């Protein structure tokens, strides 16, 4: 335990908060071929591997994930939300931050309905999270 005088001289340092999505906080200057510190809400990338994996202990499923090489050169593992997808190797996708609790090492989500990732088909509720268009309603026309 420090003395009062030691605290007056030195002071306490605030603990630095670690980022939950560090790959979104790096940019890449392609002219100078150097990484830059630019934060982005989303980043574009190309799928290198699309596969399924099993979750941690109490849960059981086949979760769909993709390994994505981002425009800043970093390769990350991203979760593909929703039922069914059309992604394969070389698909261009947009990723956002957000981990999957039962998949270790998966810190990013692929945004459905943008670039090569199609929206979830026949989705009626929570459509905006899965890139599903509003269905043409025949009841409203009558």
Swiss-Prot record:
<keyword id="KW-0699">rRNA-binding</keyword>
<dbReference type="GO" id="GO:0006412">
    <property type="term" value="P:translation"/>
</dbReference>
<dbReference type="InterPro" id="IPR012340">
    <property type="entry name" value="NA-bd_OB-fold"/>
</dbReference>
<dbReference type="GO" id="GO:0019843">
    <property type="term" value="F:rRNA binding"/>
</dbReference>
<comment type="subunit">
    <text>Part of the 30S ribosomal subunit. Contacts proteins S8 and S17. May interact with IF1 in the 30S initiation complex.</text>
</comment>
<feature type="modified residue" description="3-methylthioaspartic acid">
    <location>
        <position position="102"/>
    </location>
</feature>
<keyword id="KW-0687">Ribonucleoprotein</keyword>
<keyword id="KW-0694">RNA-binding</keyword>
<keyword id="KW-0689">Ribosomal protein</keyword>
<comment type="function">
    <text>With S4 and S5 plays an important role in translational accuracy.</text>
</comment>
<keyword id="KW-0820">tRNA-binding</keyword>
<dbReference type="InterPro" id="IPR006032">
    <property type="entry name" value="Ribosomal_uS12"/>
</dbReference>
<dbReference type="Pfam" id="PF00164">
    <property type="entry name" value="Ribosom_S12_S23"/>
</dbReference>
<comment type="similarity">
    <text>Belongs to the universal ribosomal protein uS12 family.</text>
</comment>
<dbReference type="GO" id="GO:0015935">
    <property type="term" value="C:small ribosomal subunit"/>
</dbReference>
<keyword id="KW-0488">Methylation</keyword>
<protein>
    <recommendedName>
        <fullName>Small ribosomal subunit protein uS12</fullName>
    </recommendedName>
</protein>
<feature type="region of interest" description="Disordered">
    <location>
        <begin position="1"/>
        <end position="22"/>
    </location>
</feature>
<feature type="compositionally biased region" description="Basic residues">
    <location>
        <begin position="9"/>
        <end position="19"/>
    </location>
</feature>
<dbReference type="GO" id="GO:0003735">
    <property type="term" value="F:structural constituent of ribosome"/>
</dbReference>
<comment type="function">
    <text>Interacts with and stabilizes bases of the 16S rRNA that are involved in tRNA selection in the A site and with the mRNA backbone. Located at the interface of the 30S and 50S subunits, it traverses the body of the 30S subunit contacting proteins on the other side and probably holding the rRNA structure together. The combined cluster of proteins S8, S12 and S17 appears to hold together the shoulder and platform of the 30S subunit.</text>
</comment>
<dbReference type="InterPro" id="IPR005679">
    <property type="entry name" value="Ribosomal_uS12_bac"/>
</dbReference>
<dbReference type="GO" id="GO:0000049">
    <property type="term" value="F:tRNA binding"/>
</dbReference>
């Amino acid at each position: 335990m420090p003395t009062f005088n030691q605290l007056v001289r030195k002071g306490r340092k605030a603990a630095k908060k670690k980022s939950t999505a560090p790959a979104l906080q790096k940019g890449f200057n392609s002219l100078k071929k150097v990484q830059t510190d630019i934060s982005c809400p989303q980043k574009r990338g190309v799928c290198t591997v699309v596969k399924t994996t099993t979750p941690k202990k109490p849960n059981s499923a086949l979760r769909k994930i993709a390994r994505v090489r981002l425009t800043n050169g970093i390769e990350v593992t991203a979760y593909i939300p929703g039922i069914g997808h059309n992604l394969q190797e070389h698909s261009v996708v947009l990723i956002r931050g957000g981990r999957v609790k039962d998949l270790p090492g998966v810190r990013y989500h692929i945004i459905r309905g943008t670039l090569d990732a199609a929206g979830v088909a026949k989705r009626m509720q929570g459509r905006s999270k899965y890139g599903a268009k509003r269905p043409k309603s025949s009841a409203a026309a009558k």
